[in-house]
């Protein structure tokens, strides 16, 4: 009713962009007449206008003035290079992003293409633009795909990947537009602020950032800070002993069922993700370990036992982590991908290694950390896009000061969201999922099933294999990760069945009928790899093809002969047939064979790396002009294969549309309604037909942990068969209530993480600013003398009480302390200070320090010119890093301890702020004092006589 009276505020907001859209459309005709070179020269024209405009505010005014023409130029370039033209609604999306807002754009509406508009415009300043995605695969895809537009227009495009060297990172960050993941950006920022030389710094000053899947990065991942750790020595045998004790302890029943304390050795709170020993548990653990007290400071055990219990109860193999090559590798809870190299902190990872009987790696200590909230707030202008932002609008506004605008779809939505089916037990739910998948598959429609863990995806895979339903599995297991792009390329084909772990975070569109462009590139890769790639690199064809080759082509026959006992094998064999839409004609096969021979002559026989070949195929897939004959030949081959595949893919697309489009099945409600909506959004892209349904059970984690007593009573109330779905308004309300409860719960956690990290953030920025000044070598001598002057002030204030008469001041102690710091003042006598006021004392000692420092500098510089500045930089960085590391530990300990002060009617956050501030001031004072002491004690070794080389 309010909307009818006042109008839709979002529509009113978007209406102001319409005149600019009209301007861009008017410019389109003139810009279409330009040649490629003339279009490219527009970039230089735009950039010239920024030559004398250096301040951020003035640059923003100029960017706004250039927007209509710049957007028209990008639209024309995208038409020529990608064959894609920005719709009017995409232009509006680009304006929303340019203004530093969050644009909600439904799945399939071309978010990736929209990002080219503001990223090009803001790159014209020369300050650099970061486009952020959730994983390396998407960053690479977008840099290759959308980067074509920017490269065509004369901008440089960089890409940051996990395994890059610092030199490669520096080169890529120096580009006009850099594609990277949120974690790589954050860790590079932390590493830059641990660098000991300016040449080690890879990032430049932040300017503008566009985040794809912004809710995933700024909301879902905001609970976990980015941490860089260093190793610390701890007795490793304790982890294994603790794991053995934990295995022997028994979990208590749920708390408070009959008002009686639970029996058992420890309690588990899944909501808080914590384990607590009972009195019996403490006694049993102490008895097993033969110790008197688990908290004995000389031999502490409590921390080890708690971590071992959490490893046993809360960290599940193939859900939270997988075991690969003798290591426990974390699985990202939001994307379902493995995160090699990442480890849980505080001894938790070691506890999991002990549980799994793996080699235990050394424990780590935090060297640097930051939350995503505070990291992204470092950008002067931040923007983001996602399919689902409106549900988190308040949090975006409060935490990040980001407005949210909903961009209208280009075509009306035609997706049907079918009613949820709820089952009493989990096993009944999975049988129902398998049955619906089989039914939809028979109709010739593609099916995407979203699961929440590796374990669940493999359970469903085995159920489908029993029914001989061919399917592809996409989860964190290594053999499946390697096939991600290939699986997604096929997921929209007629009858295709894809099981994906956390598909919501994968950011990849599923095209009805299949992606002929990618399949053509895959075919070319398959033909060229054995001829062009070095043998040690390996040239594995796509996984199912390789397995078929290993069995001499009788894969399906052998599986069939086994009377269904190898259902999974048969399922994969059938999936092989769907890898490519059709066989190529003999002419095209011969054409590809001839191409391989010609490329061997130019590039060498098996002389390339896999990455080099893939880069060349990616370049060939672009539409930008090329003078390279080999790239042109590759491009012709891709086009030829794609043309043949298109015939079948187009027919399949028609069949799939007629059958009803993609069907998406959710197998569990996520903790957030937004993530459920992301999964639904995979179906019905750009006005396509499609449908979705969620299958749930009363045993699902969400209902079990957050549903409370109401769900428990419902389980007893429903006296129906296991295989009968339950439909109940009361149950639906319980479900929505549970989701709202968990959303509020996690919002409070994120808010608390942010509030506490805000205290650290102010300190971090001060320390990192000091470090950067030192790295850049700006006024080092002046800075150290400033440290010395403040140290002299500290000494005076410590030993002189202004409330006492001057004759009672302990000047002997004061002089002794000054000489501890500055041994060159050994001739200073207390008599020289008599009769001076407190301020005069400070001034006198500061002058003495400056004179002593000049003498010290003369001594050091005699050894080697420039050595004094090197020593200053070394000692300042050494002290900052050492004391900051200790300060981080102290702040962690403070944060844990202030929680108890709530019982004393004190606000823990205010206590943390006040005490943390005092600790920070003390740390900075210690840093200044230690630097002064180190500088005066510094005695460089004489340079050794140069020996003749005897090599």
From Swiss-Prot:
Disulfide pairings = none
UniProt-listed GO biological process terms: intracellular protein transmembrane transport; protein import; protein targeting; protein transport by the Sec complex
Q: Identify the domain of life.
A: Bacteria
Task: Identify the GO cellular component terms for this protein.
Answer: cell envelope Sec protein transport complex; cytosol; plasma membrane-derived thylakoid membrane
Write down the Gene3D superfamilies for this protein, in alphabetical order: Helical scaffold and wing domains of SecA, P-loop containing nucleotide triphosphate hydrolases, SecA, preprotein cross-linking domain
Which chemical reaction does it catalyze? ATP + H2O + cellular proteinSide 1 = ADP + phosphate + cellular proteinSide 2
* Binding-site positions, ATP: 90, 108-112, 509
What GO molecular-function term can you cite, just one? ATP binding
Q: What UniProt keywords are attached to this protein's entry?
A: ATP-binding, Cell inner membrane, Cell membrane, Cytoplasm, Membrane, Nucleotide-binding, Protein transport, Thylakoid, Translocase, Translocation, Transport
Question: Does the keyword NAD feature in the UniProt annotation?
Answer: no
**Membrane association type:** Peripheral membrane protein
Compartments it resides in:
Cell inner membrane; Cellular thylakoid membrane; Cytoplasm
Protein's job = Part of the Sec protein translocase complex. Interacts with the SecYEG preprotein conducting channel. Has a central role in coupling the hydrolysis of ATP to the transfer of proteins into and across the cell membrane, serving as an ATP-driven molecular motor driving the stepwise translocation of polypeptide chains across the membrane.
What family is it from? Belongs to the SecA family.
Q: Which HAMAP family match?
A: SecA
Subunit structure, as described in the record: Monomer and homodimer. Part of the essential Sec protein translocation apparatus which comprises SecA, SecYEG and auxiliary proteins SecDF. Other proteins may also be involved.
Q: What is this protein called?
A: Protein translocase subunit SecA
**Upper lineage ranks?**
Bacteria, Bacillati, Cyanobacteriota, Cyanophyceae, Synechococcales
